[in-house]
């Protein structure tokens, strides 16, 4: 079973390498269990000859290596002076303005979902009810005398 699976996968790999024009190593594998020999087919090794092309260097390379001219380049500009100033501006605004002013803004945001206000209001009502001798909580949330129910039919 294992020899059959290995043989199938080896053939598939060799066929894929041959169709893509990749160099493939010839594989010969012998199983110690069943004396099965797995070797690539002779068809997989035959490839059409590659077309010959003349090698010509590009007279004007498109990508210019900035590190050859300025080894301390930060990648903002080709000019070393502008590159340093752009780097300083980015870090100043990134660190000073965004982090410092951003955290200050978040710290002074208003009460989210009014949690602090509801706590203060509950403490105020508890003090008022204790001072006037009223129960802290009533069983009825609404005054039953003010509720108007529909008449029975």
Curated annotation (Swiss-Prot):
GO cellular component: mitochondrial inner membrane; respiratory chain complex I
Pfam families, per the entry: ESSS (PF10183)
Disordered as annotated region, ranges: 40-77
Span of chain positions assigned to the transit peptide in the UniProt entry: 1-29
Cellular localization per UniProt: Mitochondrion inner membrane
UniProt keyword DNA-binding, yes or no: no
Record InterPro entries: NADH_UbQ_OxRdtase_ESSS_su
Biased composition (Basic and acidic residues): 66-77
Entry keyword Mitochondrion: yes
Membrane topology listed for this record: Single-pass membrane protein
Broad class of the protein's primary localization: mitochondrion
Alphabetized UniProt keyword annotations: Electron transport, Membrane, Mitochondrion, Mitochondrion inner membrane, Respiratory chain, Transit peptide, Transmembrane, Transmembrane helix, Transport
Bilayer-spanning residue ranges: 89-109
Subunit structure of this chain's protein: Complex I is composed of 45 different subunits. Interacts with BCAP31.
Main function: Accessory subunit of the mitochondrial membrane respiratory chain NADH dehydrogenase (Complex I), that is believed not to be involved in catalysis. Complex I functions in the transfer of electrons from NADH to the respiratory chain. The immediate electron acceptor for the enzyme is believed to be ubiquinone.
Protein family according to the UniProt entry: Belongs to the complex I NDUFB11 subunit family.
Name this protein carries in UniProt: NADH dehydrogenase [ubiquinone] 1 beta subcomplex subunit 11, mitochondrial
Species this chain originates from: Pan troglodytes (Chimpanzee)
Gene: NDUFB11
